[in-house]
Amino acid sequence: MRNTIDRFLGKLHNEDIYLIHGDMWHFDYFKQRMPNNVIDCGIQEPNIVNIASGIASQNKTVFVYGVSGMIIHRAYEQIKLNVKGWAENKGKIIFINSGHNGCYTDAGRGHLIDDDIALCNALNIETYTPTSSGG
């Protein structure tokens, strides 16, 4: 999925699109084209959401890449207040890698969170779950 997102965003070459991730690396294609639009926050999920919300409030599109369940659980209050508050109508924040999809089975139970979609639904956040990365 990372390579697909990296190529997709890199080909768009759009200054209004940002990628924020939590220590996920492998976004070289997009980063080469838009070095100021890729932000690695490390494993600080609440900060990832706060930064994404601030950028989205400036009418930018923000892709948040990480283990979605970790982001949803660790930053739920920020999502509830920021994403569903002032940022939702000014920009779009797109969380990637939702649901227990098998991507991180070797990383242990902490990476296999299966209720992130239900938590998003509780906040009336639209969720889409494609079955493949498209190559």
Which residue ranges define each predicted feature?
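Thiamine diphosphate
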Residues: M1-G135
